[in-house]
Every structure is written in structure tokens, then in C-alpha cells.
């Protein structure tokens, strides 16, 4: 499991409660292990003094990038477009992101599941939104004519951004070239507890904790306004289902 997080030894990577493997490293439950913390310094913040550098909010694999995201999109039988009104559940600030940029990435059950702020700024709105559990897009997962598609659940992550339980965190970035941006934590399958650990009015530095997923695999979204010009760094990968994790707090984009 530790290899998913970028290493070979859990005791070297994580702030374990005990080094005794027979005592399960001191974890008292699956969720206690699932929400484990990295040791200080294991995931340094990319360019902490450069507000033009955006950090990866989760230890996650790039899934999809979308530009000129529409306010409202139809859900077709094939394909899953993003729809801001549905993703943000018609939040009063939804229109601010019309025509903007959306980045989505996937966290497997073995990933590190705490969220970290991609930018320095002020938390201006944060709340949880109820949604479905085990939601699915029935048109996805039939690409293999001989057997069920084993990654069907991963394939309709875009659909889940508008249907699953999620946490919305709006940040007014210190960098005026970024301004208002939004982090959306999306529960997948049975993930029904997106825990927000910041409060409205709080200032966070890039890399500070925002919250965490509980219990299972998840996905997340970074949303930017159309005025923000970004150069994304996928670390040599093309977003999709076959990507590997980019470390949390590593550089994920640069503001032009």
C-alpha cells in the first residue's frame, strides 16, 4: 500500500502510531489508516513563495482537463460533459466560472486522502453537498464487447462530479491573477463523508490542509475562472484512466 503513496515503508512515510506491524502500526480502524498523515517534509510544497505556482491538492492521477466549461450541458448517452450548474449545484457564484478551466484527478483506495490547498488565500465559502452513493452512468463501461469493463466506475468520474456527495471550498487566492477558485472533493462509491477542516474567513498557505475523504476511493476537481491563464504540468502524462499519481503539493500548473 505504501508504494501507491511513493515509497516502500509505511513507517518511513507516514506518522504511524507504532512501528509494530503486528499491532497494525497502531491504527485503530480502517478509516484511521485511510486518513493517515505523511511525516513532515515527505511532501514539500512546490515553490512556497511563488504564488504563480499551483500545487497539487491531492495525491492523485490526472483524469481529465476541460477548457471553456459551459454553464449548462446535456448528459448524453455517450460521453460525460461537465456542467457547472450541476457540479456546483447552482451555487450563486457558479456563473463566475463559466468558460473557465477544470482539472479532475482520481484517488484510488490506496492513495493519500487528505486535501491540501493548491494556492495561498482566504477561505470565502465552504460547505458539504449531499449526493448519491454508488451512482453510475449506465452508458459507460461497455467498451469491451467480451466482458464487463473493470474500470467502469473510474470511467464515469465526470458524471459523479454532478451527482455524488461532495465538498465545496471556494478560495480567494492571494495572487490577483488567480482570484476566486474552487476545490471540489467528490466521493465515489460509498464515500459519504467529505470532512472539511478549514473555516470561512481562515487564511491558508499553499499546501495547508483543507480536509479529507473518509473510507474509500475518490476524485476531485480544481476549477478556475476564464480570466485565469494556466500552463498545466501533467508530469509527462496525458490525462486518462492509465495515469499514475502526481504527489500532493507538487507543482501542477503555472499561472501565465
Language-model-detected regions and their locations in the chain:
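Contiguous, well-folded functional domains in the mature portion of proteins
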Residues: 1-256
Amino acid at each position: 500500500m505504501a508504494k501507491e503513496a511513493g515509497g516502500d515503508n509505511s513507517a518511513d512515510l507516514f506518522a504511524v502510531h507504532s512501528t509494530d506491524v503486528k499491532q497494525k502500526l497502531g491504527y485503530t480502524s480502517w478509516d484511521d489508516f485511510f486518513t493517515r498523515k505523511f511525516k513532515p517534509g515527505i511532501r514539500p510544497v512546490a515553490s512556497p513563495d511563488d504564488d504563480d505556482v499551483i500545487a497539487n491538492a491531492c495525491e492523485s492521477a490526472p483524469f481529465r482537463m476541460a477548457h471553456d466549461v459551459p454553464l449548462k450541458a446535456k448528459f448524453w448517452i455517450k460521453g460525460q460533459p461537465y456542467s457547472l450548474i450541476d457540479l456546483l449545484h447552482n451555487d450563486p457564484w457558479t456563473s463566475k466560472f463559466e468558460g473557465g478551466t477544470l482539472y479532475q484527478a482520481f484517488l484510488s483506495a490506496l492513495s493519500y486522502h487528505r486535501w491540501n490547498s493548491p494556492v495561498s488565500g482566504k477561505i470565502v465559502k465552504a460547505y458539504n453537498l449531499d449526493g448519491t452513493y454508488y451512482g453510475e452512468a449506465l452508458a459507460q463501461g461497455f467498451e469491451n464487447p467480451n466482458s464487463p469493463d473493470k474500470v467502469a466506475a473510474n470511467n464515469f468520474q465526470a458524471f459523479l462530479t454532478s451527482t455524488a456527495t461532495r465538498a465545496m471550498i471556494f478560495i480567494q487566492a492571494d495572487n490577483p491573477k488567480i482570484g476566486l477558485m474552487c476545490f471540489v472533493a467528490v466521493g465515489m462509491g460509498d464515500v459519504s463523508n467529505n470532512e472539511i477542516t478549514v473555516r470561512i474567513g481562515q487564511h491558508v498557505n499553499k499546501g495547508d490542509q483543507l480536509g479529507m475523504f473518509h473510507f474509500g476511493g475518490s476524485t476531485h476537481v480544481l476549477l478556475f475562472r476564464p480570466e485565469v491563464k494556466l500552463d498545466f504540468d501533467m508530469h509527462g502524462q496525458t490525462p486518462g484512466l492509465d495515469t499514475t499519481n502526481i504527489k500532493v503539493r507538487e507543482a501542477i500548473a503555472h499561472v501565465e
